[in-house]
Amino acid sequence: MSSQPLSVVIITKNAATQLAECLDSASFADETLVVDSGSTDGTAELAAQHGARVVQKEWLGFGRQKQFAVEAARNDWVLCLDADERVSTPLRTRILAVLAAPAAQAYAMPRCNRFMGRWLRHGEGYPDWSLRLFDRRHARWSDDPVHEKVLTDGPVARIKGDLLHDTAETLAGYLDKQNRYTSMQAELLFKAGKRAGVALLLLSPALRFAKF
């Protein structure tokens, strides 16, 4: 049986400073697809220079945007990455082994986060199991605009090898990112008729980070 062809899909918005390393780490894939939502920093041009197929799509929210990318891919097996993530060499080896003889339709991998130059391999933050490799005929992204997840019609297997995640390099960048996420979460709660205290929205990400 021949190996299953793989598409790596990445959604982007002004990610030029991070994307090149991500694309280089995914160069083993049969296709790399970048779905961009109107970047103004040369992200789309950079992706094309690295051999990626680039599609423009207005922002739909994280879940729907990622599912659009999955459906636009040319292959059924997809690996979903963020622009600030890298496929480590051990993970690449395991992915290729899985594609040679898939035993499941979806695979989670350990994600290792780096904050301010330090890899966080202790506490709650590691291994941050992330379901990113799957056969799109048996799995899809949820429609959630934030805190999206992959929904499958079968069991999820695990593979070794770190997915490397470069988080914000500065505390200011980290807090800015958390502010954007909590704003989106607050809007979702409001639309659902729920209320969350300001203290909870502000402290939850900080308390979680303190456990790393």
Language-model-detected regions and their locations in the chain:
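Conserved donor nucleotide-binding strand/loop of the catalytic core
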Residues: 44-72
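A conserved acidic beta->alpha catalytic loop
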Residues: 25, 36-46, 82
